[in-house]
Amino acid sequence: MTRSSIPSIALIVIVLVTLVWVSRDRLMPGASREHASEKPATAVSGGATSAMFTSRAIGDPPKGEERPQIAHVAIVDLDRDGLNDVLVCDSLRNVVTWIRQATRGTFTESVIAGVSAPAHVEAIDFDKDGDLDLVVAALGFLFPNNNRVGSVIVLENDGQQKFRSHYIADRIARVADARAADLDGDGDLDVSVAGFGYDDGETSWLENKGGWKFEQHVLQQLSGPINAIPVDINGDTFLDVVALVSQEWEEIWAFINDGKGNLTPRMLWGSTNPDFGSSWMTMVDMDKDGDPDIVYANGDAFEYAPPNSRPWQGVQWLENRGDLKFELHRMIDQQGVTSPEAVDLDGNGDLDVLLVNANNDWDNPAAPSLLWLENDGKMQFTMHPIASSPTHLLTLAVGDLDGDGKPDAVTGGMHISRPYDRIGCITGWFTRR
């Protein structure tokens, strides 16, 4: 959602240049460039499943006329008391918050730290002292901006859930994603970084030099990285980085690690459509064959005023065929979708997909904001709308909130466009089955 809500002259020029550029052969070996519409969607439309969840607002409600701008949520037991909590990146109030579940079903929100336009938060024991620290990606400014106002912050936990801020990278391209992993094999945690920027961006990693000192290594200078996920994509035991690059590129890249922090770029997939609208990616073994696949949504429409979806938007999964070759399977044609999460929602042993909608026809009261793609066990999917309120849902996390062993969910609303009649900040969705 970091893309412009009003098309700029610069963006129009970039798109025109891109239309010429895509006719050239710039594919890496093993990569493919295609339009997802060339692959028919495997999902069919099923009935509504609102009875699957009960929902309620958790955390602090909006104040007065506030319109929430929640960029990311995560489910984690931060204080390790056996009850899952919720972490929130609130880009309206410029804070990272903790919605603590102190007793079962009772949620209380408190501010952890002030951060300028936080976009992603990850809980991990970064300093290996036995408690959970937080790695935060910060845009610096929510809306499009070419200034280098991005940062990566580690919030160090003192063991009592009091946090000290360490800015391990500052004044870099607006950061949409940052995740911890040992990328150079020296035993400490480094950080992969998606520097979205605007016209200028970069995918990079931050080498941990000790003493809270980090060195940035730029892997690729393309605008629009949304995700930078550490994962062993080729099965050689070394963590690579897989990046989703949006803007006019609309590509998925792998940076292959030799185990010592030397990462080589390799395109895994690219669209022929420079307006494809990449919105989010997650890595999961979707077909349970032992290697990581990619579940990938293209529902971004924030560059239009008002946000206006396109017919080619939807969700697909890229099947890992080995040797860095991926086969695209279109799952669903659906406008505005983002934040797909693979989860066995119906308990039948295969992975379904839960996802949200940030840009739909909200004047239609039935337009879904939360959807379930039901897997029939043969990788054919049936789409079920779950809810149509709140609207403008940008972020989704899955986990067991009520301790019944079944997957629940949390969503966050990004209400930067009309209508404003079904506003929600943080919503908990509790499985009934």
Language-model-derived ranges and their functions:
Residues 4-433:
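Beta-propeller-forming repeat regions
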